[in-house]
Regions:
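Active-site beta-loop-alpha junctions of metal-dependent nucleic acid enzymes
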Residues: 13-38
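Generic structural signal for secondary-structure transition and capping sites
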Residues: 34-37, 106, 129, 133
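Residue-level signal for inorganic ion chemistry
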Residues: 25, 50, 124
Length: 141
């Protein structure tokens, strides 16, 4: 799953549990359904990834799709200018979105035998998440 900065789902790929995430990175980036502006020198498209994508395949997949990859190196923590550790990065955005989706019983326990049916159910749940976010935004205005 790929999400935007606030946790809104942008694209999802369904695969077996024994497939590593870095092998699905290109498919996941291609699954984004929202039109994005073409990256330029002044406005690049950034892609923040976790340490599991710290390999040549992860870097190449992000760059070939026009993104500037931000991948924390394995064993590296963010240090401030004095050399002390700063607050940990917010890597919980995708996990929070998966938590929202796990409230749907059909997604939490996969009853659908065909992957296309399961993908459709996930996409329906993602669209409901976007609808709820828009509805809350309208109420806050």
């Amino acid at each position: 799953m790929i999400v935007e900065a606030a946790g809104g789902p942008l694209g999802v790929v369904v695969a077996g549990a024994n497939v590593h995430d870095c092998k699905l990175l290109e498919q996941t980036i291609d699954s984004i359904v929202v039109e994005r502006p073409q990256p330029t020198e002044s406005v690049p498209q950034h892609l923040c990834l976790d340490k599991g994508y710290d390999n040549p395949t992860g870097h190449a997949a992000a760059v070939s799709r026009g993104h500037t990859p931000h991948i924390r190196r394995i064993g590296e923590e963010k240090l401030d200018k004095t050399g002390r550790k700063r607050r940990k990065a917010r890597r919980w955005v995708v996990e929070r979105t998966l938590g929202w989706l796990s409230k749907c019983r059909g997604i939490l326990v996969r009853y659908a035998k065909k992957s296309c049916n399961y993908l459709g159910l996930i996409q329906l749940a993602c669209s409901l998440l976007w609808y709820r976010r828009q509805h809350r935004f309208q109420l806050l205005r």
